[in-house]
């Protein structure tokens, strides 16, 4: 398990490749600790359009447990050093959001 210090979420912008590498390096923890079956980056980071204030948008396939989702969000924010929005893939998703994920999404864990 990683140990983290407090983060200033608006000072640690990284490249798409850096975000991918950080997540890939924690694949075992994400699978075992959170039950993540797959994880995709989407949004501005996946399109290389992020700015200093951008968050990282992540779509995961995992069990619908609110507690795990909150823990996953906090884990990813500390790992990536920025604000993270986590959405869970499910069959009743907003079709516009699903379209964006399918269009721009980059599988980091598959």
Q: Language-model features: where?
A:
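Short, well-ordered beta-strand segments
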Residues: 40, 57-59
